[in-house]
């Protein structure tokens, strides 16, 4: 047998080859009629592959001695195992009208072998010199991949002295020439020429693997290892994948240690041949003698199979395969489809699925619903011009400290295998997108993936999003909308895919969220970033006795009983299968849903332009696209193939509760209300037939101690009502001031009574009141608002207190109504 450039017979290896060939011929499953690996040959023909995948559990069941020999000395027996596979293929290719795997035109074509399902999965830290040459499986996260290059496997060399040709010189992980010419009269040892046409090359790729976060001991940095991929398994592992590599550990020369400047450069001064001759210095001549001169080696892993740890179906939550082609639907077994249909038929299934999201966190149903829709996502579309329309949903959570924001991010990063969790404060622009690094061996520049690239077809969770620097926030603008990353550095110009959903968490600027201010004043995020989020949720930590009791009871129960305290309707595995099945659906918009979408968008735009209303950010076309994505995600959650109007209405409700609910904060005016009931309003102000009052004062809240002591009821109105009345009064006072300035006659301010009468008449003309009682309550609120604007906010000032009447019982009332009010010159309308 020919091996390693010489002729010798390895009897043990030959026996292993024969036993393995017998295994391929005879092994059958329990109820199978034909041999298992004859069926594997059919699969190889169908995919035009030259790699035979062997389940190592089958080898263990067939012959224990064979599995022990392969496990202990895999590197020694690997050429013989490949030869056994080739013999098996050659035997099976005759006698049938099938396309042969090895044709007559290429009889020297090799069959590669790939083992999987190794019982003992090693950790990356456990790989040492004791594992060299053994068959091992190791799991890690791919962080960098090189380009695919040709590698010389077996070289054919020509002797430059005598012209003799030496074939099949196997390369020992470095450029290996024949030791000596086979011609007995030549004795050449160094002068060789490589015949590339007769040599054997294969595809080669180097992958950088890093141990998973769960395997890193406390206080340690993550270890990394280079993995060598050959043949058909190149490009099977992408950056960000959690992968199981099966292969063996080898020792390879450390190029970096040999080429470090000033450390191991060897020089030799030859003796001068003549008296006046000068010495000649000779340094390192290249990499031909690599590993010979220096005992500098490092460990690497040569893989023969690549297997995604959690299954490609769960990794690719975007329902796109490795090549990004989403035309093929995933295949599901009948049992899986029956289970999904059973979950769909459970009463109130949608709320139960929402409750199954992050069960350790109590409440926050809206945020859990948003995370579910983000996991489902919308339908990815491509226009005729080739423009990609984003189907991924971005969610931002803004809230006070200790509101479980990070818990939601950790849960989402854990349920989706292809996900990245990072912190905005410690992440740079290059760390989030991509950076250009230099290859240590070749010196060429390559692209190293950042967090968004590692989360391609997954979810990127960014905590402390508001703590990022401005220059780093700008870097993710393109990734959030176009879902690409453009790089022009070091002579490399590339556009990379970053098809990821972003789940971000941010804290308010003042430590606590101020409900009296819009979102843009509470979060240090520019409008360009905020508009790219489909949903923005506010989490406010307000004391509430009932809610606090349930939260405390839930947390104590989780600490006491651990998993027993959590009883979600569906387990995490069931939830993953349901999401995977729902993502295989591509719902289409119906004509009725289209009409509802257009009407809803017009209504939202109208509300954005109405004076006195304050939304989190401007309504743009991005919000219309967000409505479409949310509607498609809701249709997927119901396993519908058509988007119905009910789905659109639910999406509109979600959008409103996420970005407009911030306005519904309350303003307490109990300290500013007057003792009277406002009965001095002219009688003609309660006429007309108006409809329902827009924002009535809330009288059913808990009593305020100070108000109770003085015999007053608590007066609470909505923030929207407060802002609307404030802006109307200020605008009226400004108009009056401008008219007085223009005419040059009269007082610059208005009487408080005249101002109140003007506002009530304006509202009455619009049909805002249905009874005299509502008018009285409105006047009471306006008086309290004016008092707050004067005493606390300082937006209004009193020019003249007015003349006090002689009657004692009406003095205070008429004095309050007769005082002259004006706008503070320093106040600017927002």
From Swiss-Prot:
Mind listing the GO biological process terms from this record?
A: DNA replication; DNA replication initiation; double-strand break repair via break-induced replication; mitotic DNA replication
Which source organism? Oryza sativa subsp. japonica
Q: Where is this region: Disordered?
A: 671-710
Taxonomy, top ranks, is: Eukaryota, Viridiplantae, Streptophyta, Embryophyta, Tracheophyta
Keywords on record: ATP-binding, Cell cycle, DNA replication, DNA-binding, Helicase, Hydrolase, Metal-binding, Nucleotide-binding, Nucleus, Zinc, Zinc-finger
Reaction(s) catalysed by this chain's protein: ATP + H2O = ADP + phosphate + H(+)
Q: How does it assemble?
A: Component of the minichromosome maintenance (MCM) complex, a heterotetramer composed of MCM2, MCM3, MCM4, MCM5, MCM6 and MCM7.
Q: What is its EC number?
A: 3.6.4.12
Supply one GO molecular-function term. ATP binding
Stored SUPFAM superfamilies = Nucleic acid-binding proteins, P-loop containing nucleoside triphosphate hydrolases
Q: What is this protein called?
A: DNA replication licensing factor MCM6
Quote the record's binding site residues for ATP. Answer: 399-406
One GO cellular component term of this record is: nucleus
Matches recorded under InterPro entries: MCM, MCM6, Mcm6_C, MCM_CS, MCM_dom, MCM_lid, MCM_N, MCM_OB
Function, please? Probable component of the MCM2-7 complex (MCM complex) that may function as a DNA helicase and which is essential to undergo a single round of replication initiation and elongation per cell cycle in eukaryotic cells.
The places in or outside the cell where this protein is found are: Nucleus
């Amino acid at each position: 047998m020919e091996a390693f450039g010489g002729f010798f017979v390895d009897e043990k290896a030959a026996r292993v080859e024969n036993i393995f060939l017998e295994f391929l011929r005879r092994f059958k499953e329990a109820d199978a009629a034909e041999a298992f690996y004859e069926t594997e040959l059919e699969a190889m023909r169908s995919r035009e592959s030259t790699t035979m995948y062997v389940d190592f559990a089958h080898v263990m069941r067939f012959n224990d001695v064979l599995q022990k020999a392969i496990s202990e000395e895999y590197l020694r027996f690997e050429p013989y195992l490949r030869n056994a596979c080739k013999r098996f293929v050659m035997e099976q290719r005759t006698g049938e009208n099938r396309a042969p795997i090895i044709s007559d035109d290429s009889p020297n074509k090799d069959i590669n072998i790939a083992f999987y399902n190794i019982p003992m999965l090693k950790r990356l830290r456990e790989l040492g010199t004791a594992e060299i040459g053994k068959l091992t499986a190791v799991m890690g996260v791919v962080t960098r991949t090189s380009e695919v290059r040709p590698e010389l496997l077996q070289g054919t060399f020509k002797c430059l002295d005598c012209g003799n040709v030496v074939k099949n010189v196997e390369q020992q992980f470095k450029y290996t020439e024949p030791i000596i010419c086979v011609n007995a009269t030549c004795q050449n040892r160094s002068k060789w020429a490589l015949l590339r046409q007769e040599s054997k090359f294969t595809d080669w790729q180097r992958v950088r693997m890093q141990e998973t976060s769960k395997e890193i001991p406390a206080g340690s940095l993550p270890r990394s290892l280079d993995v060598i991929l050959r043949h058909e398994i190149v490009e099977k592992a992408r950056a960000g994948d959690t992968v199981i590599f099966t292969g063996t550990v080898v020792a390879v020369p450390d190029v970096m240690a040999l080429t470090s400047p000033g450390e191991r450069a060897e020089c030799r001064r030859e003796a001068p041949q003549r008296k006046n001759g000068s010495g000649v210095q000779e340094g390192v001549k290249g990499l031909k003698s690599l590993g010979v001169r220096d005992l500098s080696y490092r460990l690497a892993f040569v893989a023969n199979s690549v297997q995604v740890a959690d299954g490609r179906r769960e990794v690719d939550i975007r329902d796109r395969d490795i090549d990004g082609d989403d035309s093929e639907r995933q295949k599901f077994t009948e049992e899986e489809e029956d289970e999904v249909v059973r979950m769909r038929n459970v009463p109130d299934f949608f709320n139960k699925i929402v409750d199954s999201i992050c069960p350790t966190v109590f409440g926050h149903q809206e945020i859990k619903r948003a995370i579910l829709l983000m996991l489902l996502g919308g339908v990815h579309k491509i226009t005729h011009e080739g423009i990609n329309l984003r189907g991924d949903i971005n969610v931002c959570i803004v809230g006070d400290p200790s509101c479980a924001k990070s818990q939601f991010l950790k849960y989402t990063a854990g349920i989706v295998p292809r996900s990245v969790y990072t912190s905005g404060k410690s992440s740079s622009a290059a760390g989030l997108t991509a950076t250009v690094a230099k290859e240590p061996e070749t010196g060429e520049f390559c692209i190293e993936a950042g967090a968004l690239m590692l989360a391609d077809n997954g979810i990127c969770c960014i905590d402390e999003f508001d703590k990022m620097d401005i220059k780093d926030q700008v870097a993710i603008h393109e990734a959030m909308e176009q879902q690409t990353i453009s790089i022009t550095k070091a002579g490399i110009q590339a556009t990379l895919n970053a098809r990821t959903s972003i789940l971000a968490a941010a804290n308010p600027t003042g430590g606590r969220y101020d409900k009296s201010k819009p979102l843009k004043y509470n979060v240090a995020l520019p409008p360009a970033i905020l508009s790219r989020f489909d949903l923005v949720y506010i989490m406010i930590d307000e004391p509430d006795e009932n809610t606090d009791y349930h939260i405390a009871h839930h947390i104590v129960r989780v600490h006491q009983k651990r998993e027993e305290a959590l009883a979600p309707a569906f387990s995490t595995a069931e939830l993953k299968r349901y999401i995977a099945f729902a993502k295989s659906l591509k719902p289409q918009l119906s004509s009725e849903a289209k009409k509802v979408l257009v009407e809803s968008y017009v209504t939202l735009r109208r509300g954005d332009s109405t004076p006195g209303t304050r939304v989190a950010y401007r309504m743009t076309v991005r919000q219309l696209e967000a409505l479409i994505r949310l509607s498609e995600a809701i249709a997927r959650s119901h396993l519908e193939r058509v988007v119905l109007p009910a789905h659109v209405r639910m999406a509109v409700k979600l959008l409103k509760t996420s970005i407009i609910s911030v306005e519904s904060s309350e303003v307490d005016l109990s300290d500013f209300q007057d003792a009277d009931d406002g009965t001095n309003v002219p009688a003609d102000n309660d006429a007309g037939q108006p409809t329902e009052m827009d924002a009535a004062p809330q009288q059913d809240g808990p009593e305020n101690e100070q108000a109770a002591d003085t015999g007053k009821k608590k007066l609470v109105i909505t923030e929207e009502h407060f802002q609307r009345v404030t802006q109307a009064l200020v605008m009226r006072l400004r108009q009056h001031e401008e008219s007085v300035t223009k005419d040059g006659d009269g007082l610059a301010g208005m009487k408080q009574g005249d101002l109140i009468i003007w506002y009530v008449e304006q509202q009455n003309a619009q049909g805002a009141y249905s009874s005299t009682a509502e008018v009285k309550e409105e006047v009471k609120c306006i008086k309290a608002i004016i008092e707050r604007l004067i005493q606390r906010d300082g937006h209004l000032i009193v020019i003249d207190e007015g003349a006090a009447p002689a009657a004692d019982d009406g003095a205070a009332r008429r004095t309050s109504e007769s005082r002259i009010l004006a706008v503070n010159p320093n106040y600017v309308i927002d």
